[in-house]
Amino acid sequence: MKAKVHVTLKQGILDPQGKAIEHALDSLGFRNAANVRVGKYMELDLDEKDKAKAEAQVKQMCEKLLANTIIEEYRYELQ
């Protein structure tokens, strides 16, 4: 089973990398890009057939390591 995990900063948390990209896009003439947010994307191959068990494992991975839940939020999908 494959897990796709997206981790982003929570709303209200300053994203300096996103701001830098937004300014760079503006300087390149892409003036219609605004509120750029940068995050992380991960794919994990899980050796698990049971979807409920895989979901529980991915949630634990996110809570314990993949996301800093104080400032980041995460979402995932299983395939």
Predicted feature residues:
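Helix N-cap motif at beta-to-alpha junctions
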Residues: 48-51
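Long, contiguous binding/interaction regions
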Residues: 2-4, 8-41, 53-79
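Short, well-ordered beta-strand segments in beta-rich or mixed alpha/beta enzyme
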Residues: 42-46
